[in-house]
């Protein structure tokens, strides 16, 4: 098939996903919806990399003892975290990556650096990443400074919007 990709599927310990769909080696599952919108019954969710599946498990699936399968499927929808398919075929179970807490923190900080521009927070982030300052008080100060700046900006915006009658 032309639109066929290697993907990765997380399941619970019993090889089921939310809604009770069973995932078995050699079996193809199909989405029941007609559209292509993520986070709906229109598509089956998967990841392009097993490490992303594990890192996003707490946010997306929340499986306590997940299993991961290499699957083949089409891609009809995607965001920066996952993809959506109309069909997915289970190839085989594979080893679940086990990122350390340091890998998880590093990933979170790198994601933050992609979008957050507060200079105090960015300085703390780079110091944490290069190992020069991983003290808890430095992290707390950076979080406080970043939150304070954002809250002030939000408060100013709220004041302006109300003053303008919006």
Residue ranges: model-predicted function:
Residues 1-166:
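Short, glycine-biased loop/turn motifs at secondary-structure junctions and
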